[in-house]
């Protein structure tokens, strides 16, 4: 059941945990520079590096093509956050220093709202982002 659940949801099992230094993640690399955050890794595959911080997401908006396999790699430099994309089964907890990885293919174009569903401080209720899926 665990294998089916993790495969169906597109979640990478915990044995493949990736880590980053939360004190320097904003200084260099794909999480620090929104211009480097969306990387085409194959003919119809993209990796998106998302930084969840108090109280927002970077990059914002995130633009991806419809029908492509998207691998989100999400981390935080400060506190625990959530990364839930409304209208999808994407829902991961984001811990400082750890990279939460999830795969998803958007079958429909449009705008999808990202919300933080882990209380992260006084501005939590304003923590939103947007994914724009283009045809």
UniProtKB/Swiss-Prot annotation:
EC number: 7.1.1.9
Catalyzed reaction equations: 4 Fe(II)-[cytochrome c] + O2 + 8 H(+)(in) = 4 Fe(III)-[cytochrome c] + 2 H2O + 4 H(+)(out)
Residues that bind Cu cation: 81, 116, 120, 124
Membrane topology classification: Peripheral membrane protein
Keywords attached to this entry: Cell membrane, Copper, Electron transport, Membrane, Metal-binding, Respiratory chain, Translocase, Transmembrane, Transport
One cellular-component annotation, GO: plasma membrane
Domain of life: Bacteria
One GO MF term: copper ion binding
PROSITE patterns listed in its UniProt record: COX2, COX2_CUA
Subcellular location: Cell membrane
Family affiliation: Belongs to the cytochrome c oxidase subunit 2 family.
Chain's role: Subunits I and II form the functional core of the enzyme complex. Electrons originating in cytochrome c are transferred via heme a and Cu(A) to the binuclear center formed by heme a3 and Cu(B).
PANTHER family assigned: CYTOCHROME C OXIDASE SUBUNIT II, NITROUS-OXIDE REDUCTASE
Protein name per the record: Cytochrome c oxidase subunit 2
């Amino acid at each position: 059941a665990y294998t089916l659940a993790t495969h169906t949801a597109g979640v990478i099992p915990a044995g493949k945990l990736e880590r980053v230094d939360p004190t320097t993640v904003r200084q260099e690399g794909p999480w620090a520079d929104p211009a480097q955050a969306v990387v085409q890794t194959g003919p119809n595959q993209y990796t998106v590096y998302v930084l969840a911080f108090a109280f927002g997401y970077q990059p914002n908006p995130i633009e991806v093509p419809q029908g492509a396999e998207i691998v989100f790699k999400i981390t935080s430099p400060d506190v625990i956050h959530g990364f839930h994309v409304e209208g999808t089964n994407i829902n991961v907890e984001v811990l400082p220093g750890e990279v939460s990885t999830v795969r998803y293919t958007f079958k429909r174009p449009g705008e999808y709202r990202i919300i933080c569903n882990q209380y992260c401080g006084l501005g939590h209720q304003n923590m939103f982002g947007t994914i724009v899926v283009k045809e």
